[in-house]
């Protein structure tokens, strides 16, 4: 028996990951102003990992209020380079700036998942991956962005490792699912513990 999971997100990629794992999923996008929640957290020195957890919890809690009794999953991912937190680039120039800043350096992807039922947090987890980009020539960055187009605007790092973006990297440390935005293995383990999925 599988309980329906309400995904507090409009992300087709996260929904597809959950469906591919055999879960019964309904997407209900959260109505949360992420930047308004995030700004005071960053100003007070909250870690990028904890920012991701707070945002994931806010999304799950907001949707949980609209879906009484449902098991709601909230997710968020932050990218940090030292103390700097990156957001999805707004345009191709922003994507170019992201890749120039990340070139030759190691950044961290922090993927948070939170399960909530009736406003009560049942579980929270953040997976962390270290991503080392190779040194990128500005000309190569321009050609790469021309190749991938608007896909560069769909992720916080302006790349998708499941596609052409893998060519940007020298070394990756961490779980694939964490890198693409959802710590799936720990989530599945918790869903089994809760009896929400068979296992």
From Swiss-Prot:
Its EC number is 3.6.1.-. Keywords: Cytoplasm, Hydrolase, Nucleotide metabolism. GO terms for molecular function: nucleoside triphosphate diphosphatase activity. It is found in: Cytoplasm. It catalyses: N(7)-methyl-GTP + H2O = N(7)-methyl-GMP + diphosphate + H(+). It comes from Mesorhizobium japonicum (strain LMG 29417 / CECT 9101 / MAFF 303099). This is 7-methyl-GTP pyrophosphatase. The active site is at residue 76.
């Amino acid at each position: 028996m599988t309980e329906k999971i309400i995904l507090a997100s409009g992300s087709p990629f996260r929904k597809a990951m959950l469906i591919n794992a055999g879960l019964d999923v309904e997407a209900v996008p959260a109505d949360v102003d992420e930047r308004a929640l995030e700004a005071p957290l960053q100003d007070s020195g909250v870690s990028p990992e904890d920012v991701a957890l707070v945002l994931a919890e806010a999304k799950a809690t907001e949707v949980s209020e609209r879906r009484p009794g449902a098991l709601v999953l909230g997710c968020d991912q932050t990218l940090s380079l030292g103390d700097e937190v990156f957001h999805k680039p707004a345009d191709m120039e922003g994507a170019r700036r992201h890749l120039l800043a990340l070139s030759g350096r190691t950044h961290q992807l922090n993927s948070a998942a939170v399960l909530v039922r009736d406003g009560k947090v049942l579980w929270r987890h953040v997976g962390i991956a270290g991503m080392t980009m190779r040194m990128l020539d500005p000309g190569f960055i321009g050609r790469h962005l021309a190749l991938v187009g608007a896909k560069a605007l769909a992720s916080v790092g302006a790349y998708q490792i499941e596609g052409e973006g893998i060519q940007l990297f020298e070394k990756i440390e961490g779980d694939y699912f964490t890198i693409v935005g959802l710590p799936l293995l720990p989530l599945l383990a918790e869903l089994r513990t809760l009896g929400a999925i068979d296992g």
